[in-house]
Amino acid sequence: MDSSQYMLKATLTQMCLCSRGVRNVHSEHPQQQDSSLTLWRPWLLGAGDRELDGQQRRSGEADGVPTNTGPKGALGFQHPVRLYMPKSKTSEYLQHMGRKVLASFPVQATIHFYNDDSDSEEEDEEEEMEFYNYYQNCAANGVDSSRGSSDNYSVQGGPKRNIGSHAGSA
């Protein structure tokens, strides 16, 4: 490598490091791999960020308002930001809602789908309430609900009605 290319590389490296506010700790040995430098990630606080965060907490506590917030990144969000959406809304999300959510959300975020069994839970609760109401009605009317088999009663809380040719034989 000739000296002009070496000088250009050293100058570019120094400019990039200075623009990020990081000192070039290996300027004496440019041949060494620069493994101590890391990429900036908004959810990891640097030394300057920790000092600033500590000063902000102390100033808030001096005002009589204790601040008990964790480390936050851009716009007060703790990174990485995850938006949770039920799997039952997947098709709706893919059609139009996802673009609107991500466009209106001010930071980079990922959307995670979770199992949404609320529909089946609601159906189960309705069935339980119907059985409960049926047995309450039986108790109020003096009917022994344990007498017959459960096959003789429908979910709606009454005896099953035979439809068709078997109507008279039941």
UniProtKB/Swiss-Prot annotation:
Residues 142-155 have a biased composition (Polar residues). Residues 79-114 are annotated as: Ripply homology domain. A motif (WRPW motif) lies at residues 40-43. GO terms for biological process: anterior/posterior axis specification; cellular response to retinoic acid; ectodermal placode formation; embryonic pattern specification; negative regulation of DNA-binding transcription factor activity; negative regulation of DNA-templated transcription; negative regulation of transcription by RNA polymerase II. Pfam families: Ripply. At neurula stage, expressed in the region close to the heart mesoderm. At the tailbud stage, expressed in the pharyngeal region. Induction: Up-regulated by retinoc acid (RA) in the pre-placodal ectoderm (PPE) during development. Residues 51-61 have a biased composition (Basic and acidic residues). Keywords: Developmental protein, Nucleus, Repressor, Transcription, Transcription regulation. One of its GO terms (cellular component) is nucleus. Its main location: nucleus. It is found in: Nucleus. GO terms for molecular function: transcription coregulator activity. Residues 51-78, 142-170 are annotated as: Disordered. InterPro entries: Ripply_fam (IPR028127). Belongs to the ripply family. Interacts with tbx1 and tle4/grg4. Acts as a transcriptional corepressor. Negative regulator of the transcriptional activity of tbx1 that plays a key role in pharyngeal development. Plays a role in the formation of the anteroposterior (AP) axis during embryonic development; required to establish the posterolateral border of the pre-placodal ectoderm (PPE) acting downstream of the retinoic acid receptor (RAR) signaling. The Ripply homology domain and the WRPW motif are both necessary for its transcriptional corepressor activity on the transcription activator tbx1. PANTHER family: PROTEIN RIPPLY-LIKE (PTHR16770), PROTEIN RIPPLY3 (PTHR16770:SF4). This is Protein ripply3. It comes from Xenopus laevis (African clawed frog).
